């Protein structure tokens, strides 16, 4: 892999990927594994890869497998619980584990550098939510993918699972939790760097750092021309395929491309903040990702959780994220990002979405009013003995929620969405959670929609099955296949 901020020695590539985070690096590795001769350029506006949403402290949630996140199992007005999204996300995460296991088997990844085993726990502390969690547990644990989920409303047992949360809690309070021991914490910044490292010796992948995309245009000969600028000057590169994987910045790039498919989208930026524990004794006492229920109107990346994370070899304890609002689409973006994204084609849908999501607006206003004492008060609902002096505020990454024009007007879309041009020459990834944890499945969708002919060839099919032994099969409805897949992944990734 060539790292450079000089002018390009070559101007023609098979694929240009904008953004050097987990999404672009995942796609680059997949393309290189499928076709080692493919020439790929990755362009990053910052001075190093994975400094935006892929960074460990910027990511709103890591290791998403729908084990503990309530927003993936919504409760309908009639009281029934929909687990379909949880099944989709869980199988997508298994696909990611499967790929990392294969790369580990090939000697191209070392899981200890980015992956740790951490229990995933859902916790509730009122009678109504206890009943909901019990229903959720019964429905999920009846499914093979979640059969190892544990339930407890026993306070002594819960004190063993989550001592910080149970210590000095009101004895009259109704509490309950579910636990999945086979949970993970993933440092996607470290994984991004590991992916890029695997490409180092190929000579087919070039990484341009501190390089800004100035313009995107379509040439007559079915080629994209991307104008780039850095300290060395301005220049153009060309490629038949362009991927916009620049996190919150992808929307602006998509609009700049001019493709018809991009005109129906807008974006609503949501910022985030963590409380980070500075007491090493407390950090060592908590070993879990513990999710609670979100407030009404809260965006999905703002579900409160007390979160064990590793950054390098250091263990951290975070609480949050608390949501906020500013007009940037990236943490290192411009305050003009939001206003510049408003166009004639998306103006009405954005107004309609705002009117239909007053709870979200109200929630964000409330979050903006919080001071440090207010945030500690929220933390105490999780951790009753929390002291203000043990926690400091840290700015998390920026997210852009999708606003999409539909036949019913503007709709706020949760999750991620792949947008492709009609000819498959351009793909953009919009949205947020669960994002990184399901990157392999998302990039397989990009390949299917943009490289369909090659995806159907015997060579690519064989290579995909080598990398993903369960490729093309439904692991949600095949118990023996899922068991075999998990045994292989756990063995290779050290998850036992």
Swiss-Prot record:
> What Gene3D superfamilies does the record point to?
D-Amino Acid Oxidase, subunit A, domain 2, FAD/NAD(P)-binding domain
Q: What is this protein called?
A: Probable malate:quinone oxidoreductase
- What is catalysed by this protein? (S)-malate + a quinone = a quinol + oxaloacetate
Q: What's a Gene Ontology MF term here?
A: 2-hydroxyglutarate dehydrogenase activity
Answer yes or no on keyword Electron transport.
Answer: no
Q: What Enzyme Commission number does this protein have?
A: 1.1.5.4
Species: Prochlorococcus marinus (strain SARG / CCMP1375 / SS120)
Q: Where is the signal peptide?
A: none
Alphabetical UniProt keywords:
FAD, Flavoprotein, Oxidoreductase, Tricarboxylic acid cycle
Q: Which InterPro entries match?
A: FAD/NAD-bd_sf, MQO
Give me the gene this protein comes from. Answer: mqo
In the record, biological process GO terms are: tricarboxylic acid cycle
Q: Which family does it belong to?
A: Belongs to the MQO family.
Cofactor(s) required, per the database record: FAD
Pfam families assigned: Mqo
Can you tell which superkingdom this protein's organism belongs to?
A: Bacteria
Q: In which pathway does it act?
A: Carbohydrate metabolism; tricarboxylic acid cycle; oxaloacetate from (S)-malate (quinone route): step 1/1
């Amino acid at each position: 892999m060539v790292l450079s901020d000089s002018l390009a020695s070559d101007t023609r590539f098979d694929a240009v990927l904008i953004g050097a985070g987990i999404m672009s690096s995942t796609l680059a590795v997949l393309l290189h594994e499928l076709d080692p001769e493919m020439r790929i350029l990755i362009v990053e506006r910052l001075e190093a890869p994975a400094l935006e949403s892929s960074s460990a402290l910027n990511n709103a949630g890591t290791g998403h497998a729908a084990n503990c996140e309530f927003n993936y199992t919504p409760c309908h007005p009639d009281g029934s619980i929909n687990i379909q999204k949880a099944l989709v996300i869980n199988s997508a995460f298994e696909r990611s584990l499967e790929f990392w296991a294969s790369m580990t088997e090939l000697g191209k990844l070392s899981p200890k550098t980015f992956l740790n085993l951490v229990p995933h726990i859902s916790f509730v502390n009122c009678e109504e939510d206890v009943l909901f969690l019990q229903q959720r547990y019964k429905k999920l644990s009846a499914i093979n993918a979640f059969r190892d989920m544990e339930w407890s409303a026993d306070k002594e047992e819960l004190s063993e699972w989550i001592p910080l949360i149970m210590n000095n809690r009101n004895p009259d309070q109704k509490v309950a939790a579910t636990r999945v021991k086979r949970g993970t914490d993933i440092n996607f910044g470290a994984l991004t760097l590991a992916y890029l490292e695997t490409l180092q010796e190929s000579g087919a992948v070039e990484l341009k750092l501190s390089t800004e995309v100035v313009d995107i245009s379509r040439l007559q000969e079915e080629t994209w021309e991307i104008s780039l600028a850095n300290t060395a000057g301005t220049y153009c590169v060309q490629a038949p395929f362009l991927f916009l994987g620049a996190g919150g910045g992808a929307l602006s790039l998509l609009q700049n491309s001019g493709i018809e498919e991009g005109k129906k989208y807008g974006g609503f930026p949501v910022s985030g903040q963590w409380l980070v524990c500075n007491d090493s004794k407390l950090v060592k006492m908590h070993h879990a990702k513990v999710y609670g229920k979100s407030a009404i109107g809260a965006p999905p990346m703002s579900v409160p959780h007390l979160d064990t994370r590793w950054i390098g070899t250091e263990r951290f304890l975070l609480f949050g994220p608390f949501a906020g609002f500013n007009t940037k689409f990236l943490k290192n973006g411009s305050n003009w990002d939001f206003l510049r994204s408003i166009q004639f084609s998306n103006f009405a849908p954005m107004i309609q979405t705002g009117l239909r999501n007053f709870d979200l607006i109200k929630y964000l206003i409330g979050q903006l009013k919080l001071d440090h004492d207010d945030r500690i008060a929220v933390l105490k609902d999780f951790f009753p003995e929390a002291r203000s002096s043990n926690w400091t505020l840290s700015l998390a990454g920026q997210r852009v929620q999708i606003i999409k024009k539909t036949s019913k007007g503007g709709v706020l879309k949760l999750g991620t969405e792949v947008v492709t041009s009609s000819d498959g020459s351009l793909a953009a990834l919009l949205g947020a959670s669960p994002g990184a944890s399901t990157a392999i499945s998302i990039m397989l969708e990009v390949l299917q929609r943009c490289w369909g002919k090659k995806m159907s060839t015997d060579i690519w099919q064989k290579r995909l099955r080598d990398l993903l032994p369960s490729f093309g099969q439904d692991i949600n409805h095949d118990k023996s296949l899922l068991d075999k897949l998990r045994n292989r992944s756990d063995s290779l990734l050290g998850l036992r």
